[in-house]
Amino acid sequence: MKWLLLLGLVALSECIIYKVPLVRKKSLRRNLSEHGLLKDFLKKHNLNPASKYFPQAEAPTLIDEQPLENYLDVEYFGTIGIGTPAQNFTVVFDTGSSNLWVPSVYCYSLACMDHNLFNPQDSSTYRATSKTVSITYGTGSMTGILGYDTVKVGGISDTNQIFGLSETEPGFFLYFAPFDGILGLAYPSISSSGATPVFDNIWNQRLVSQDLFSVYLSADDQSGSVVIFGGIDSSYYTGSLNWVPVSVEGYWQISVDSITMNGKTIACAKGCQAIVDTGTSLLTGPTSPIANIQSDIGASENSDGEMVVSCSAISSLPDIVFTINGVQYPLPPSAYILQSQGSCTSGFQGMDVPTESGELWILGDVFIRQYFTVFDRANNQVGLAPVA
């Protein structure tokens, strides 16, 4: 009987995984476009995806340079609860950053008016700090304070979690954002205030059985996407997972062997670095090879600054193949051409980031929708397999 009990406990310990459903909504770009505000927004805000990954040096006032314009195209969001009783927030689960922040009742900016606001006085488990935080973007900063509370994520009660409470959010555009805040899932080394990231705090408390999480992004317009904390669900992918070592432990950065089209190398001829980022919708790379790719697929810029493609051309376009750790990962045109409301746009975006390793690419949702992705902190590796 004791052996049966022990086996039962072992089985339970191997099953401590939690799934957080993600909902696909209209992006901030789409909301601004529908309100006739996109062109004006793009004129006033210089979009620079690179600034998310290589910010300016952090100052003693805990300034985190992560431009929120970089979430312009993000479409996948999940719900978390903060406090006791829980106050719910819609957040971006972002493997390209490490901090958690949400709007608070102390924020009177227009951007906060139509979002859920955290009220510390309504939580019996909230613990204040004297630390402040500032996230700089565009023409101003989101400023706020840091506090501790219980964060509920997919059934997990993550106690004593540090997070940011916004007090000011400049600019009108965040008013139209389909999310309240950001939940970062990258390494603690890039946490702006030295704050322990959510997943690290979860693992430190052994609230999950494995030091990893995985992501499935559905192409479905609304449901089916999920973040899995503490495990892997093989029903979301076909074949076996191929493992890729993390090359730099900060972002989820890996090495790419080459990028080809029709058997011809079009980029990354001598290898390059890439960041796997759920918080970036598009697939970005250096401006020169991206410009060549845009030309090859027949993309041209419209008045809103979008790279549009003829929808009728999709069936004749070739796959673009990323070879990673010796394994080929093809992206069909149905993946890298984004179709919405009868129009088609390119899923590629130019971005120049000088690094010691050379050119840098960002494998955003365009890539992750095709490949179930495991972020393995225990072994510092990323697992990839074709989605089921």
Swiss-Prot record:
InterPro entries referenced in this protein's UniProt entry, alphabetically: Aspartic_peptidase_A1, Aspartic_peptidase_AS, Aspartic_peptidase_N, Pepsin_A, PEPTIDASE_A1, Peptidase_aspartic_dom_sf
Active site: D94, D277
Pfam families found in the cross-reference section: A1_Propeptide, Asp
EC number: 3.4.23.1
Keywords: Aspartyl protease, Digestion, Disulfide bond, Glycoprotein, Hydrolase, Phosphoprotein, Protease, Secreted, Signal, Zymogen
PROSITE patterns: ASP_PROTEASE (PS00141), PEPTIDASE_A1 (PS51767)
Coiled-coil stretches: none
Cited SUPFAM superfamilies: Acid proteases
BP-aspect Gene Ontology terms: digestion; proteolysis
Record field: catalytic activity: Preferential cleavage: hydrophobic, preferably aromatic, residues in P1 and P1' positions. Cleaves 1-Phe-|-Val-2, 4-Gln-|-His-5, 13-Glu-|-Ala-14, 14-Ala-|-Leu-15, 15-Leu-|-Tyr-16, 16-Tyr-|-Leu-17, 23-Gly-|-Phe-24, 24-Phe-|-Phe-25 and 25-Phe-|-Tyr-26 bonds in the B chain of insulin
Domain Peptidase A1 intervals: 76-385
Record-listed Phosphoserine modification sites: S130
Signal peptide interval: 1-15
Post-translational changes noted in the entry: Each pepsinogen is converted to corresponding pepsin at pH 2.0 in part as a result of the release of a 47 AA activation segment and in part as a result of stepwise proteolytic cleavage via an intermediate form(s).
GO annotation, cellular component aspect: extracellular exosome
CDD domains in UniProt: pepsin_A
Glycosylation sites: N88
Signal as UniProt keyword: yes
Further remark: The expression of pepsinogen genes is regulated by hormones and related substances.
Family, per entry: Belongs to the peptidase A1 family.
Protein name (Swiss-Prot/TrEMBL): Pepsin A-4
Organism: Macaca fuscata fuscata (Japanese macaque)
Origin organism lineage: Eukaryota, Metazoa, Chordata, Craniata, Vertebrata
Gene name of the encoded protein: PGA
